Every structure is written in C-alpha cells, then in structure tokens.
C-alpha cells in the first residue's frame, strides 16, 4: 500500500534566536516566533508523514500548550513522528519540500538539509528533495516577515 501526505507550516520572524530550517542553522539576523525551534520545513514534513499514516498532525502529537515542547528541537519531533509511522508498518518512499522565502537564500544550505532529513527518516538522501522559491516580493514572505513551507511525503507499507 502507498499513502501520500501533505503538510504546510508558516512562522513569522521576530525572535532573537537562531534560524533553523530543515534541521540546519541558516545565518540570518532573526529567528522565528515559535513554541519550539520553529523549523517550518521539518514541521511541514512532520505533518506530511503523520497525515500519510492517518496519525493526525504535529499539533495533536506535540501540542504547543505542553511545556515539554518549549524550544524543542524539531529533528527530535520528526524522529518521534516517524517512529510512530514505522510502528504502523510504513517506510519512506520519498519526500519533497518547498521552502517559500524571500530571504535568506536557501541554496547554500539545501544539501545539508537533505542529509539531516535523510538521517532522521532512515532513508537514502536520493529519497529527499528540498527546494526553495520566492513569492516575487508579494505577500508576507515577499515582505520578509516570515517563511512558509509545504511538504509531501510518500509512504510505502513495509
């Protein structure tokens, strides 16, 4: 059996903290306003794999009202979500992530993001795609107020 999941996340800039995207610290003058580390890429991906396995979403599994997830490392959240997906008998077919940001530039960091995600999902790096685009200076991402991200995950029954 093959299952597809889709995830979306957005965070505004505004915190004096590192900017973490795809599990990688991206040099920038500000970080995200968020309960956890605010990693939009991993949050969207976590939602995608949870959705594909019919396990709800990131907010159900890791509620932002629970202080144990305050400033949580999103790689840990992704790994726990994937553990639950594996318990249901699924492995990764492939994942595809689109980061929507006017700034900062993502290209220099994409290979590192792919490697970390592949490690967390226990799959080959060729099963992980990360790309970035802008909104041509339109909307909140175009005004550099934050970043959005979409992700799709294909799960295969083991």
From Swiss-Prot:
Q: Which reaction does it catalyse?
A: 4-CDP-2-C-methyl-D-erythritol 2-phosphate = 2-C-methyl-D-erythritol 2,4-cyclic diphosphate + CMP
* Site residues by UniProt (Transition state stabilizer): 35, 134
**Any note on cofactor binding?**
Binds 1 divalent metal cation per subunit.
Q: What class of enzyme is it?
A: lyase
The record's section on InterPro entries has: MECDP_synthase, MECDP_synthase_CS, MECDP_synthase_sf
Q: Describe its assembly.
A: Homotrimer.
Q: What is this protein called?
A: 2-C-methyl-D-erythritol 2,4-cyclodiphosphate synthase
Gene coding for it? ispF
């Amino acid at each position: 059996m093959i299952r597809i999941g889709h995830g979306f996340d957005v965070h505004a800039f505004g915190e004096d903290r590192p900017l973490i995207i795809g599990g990688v610290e991206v040099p920038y003058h500000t970080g995200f306003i968020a309960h956890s580390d605010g990693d939009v890429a991993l949050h969207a991906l976590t939602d995608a794999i949870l959705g594909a396995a019919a396990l709800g979403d990131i907010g159900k599994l890791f509620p932002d009202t629970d202080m144990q997830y305050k400033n949580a490392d999103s790689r840990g959240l992704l790994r726990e979500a994937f553990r639950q997906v594996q318990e249901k008998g699924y492995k990764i077919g492939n994942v595809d992530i689109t980061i929507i940001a006017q700034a900062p530039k993502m290209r220099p960091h994409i290979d590192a993001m792919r490697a970390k995600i592949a490690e967390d999902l226990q799959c080959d790096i060729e099963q992980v795609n990360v790309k970035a685009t802008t909104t041509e200076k339109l909307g909140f991402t175009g005004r550099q107020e934050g970043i959005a991200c979409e992700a799709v995950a294909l799960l295969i029954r083991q």
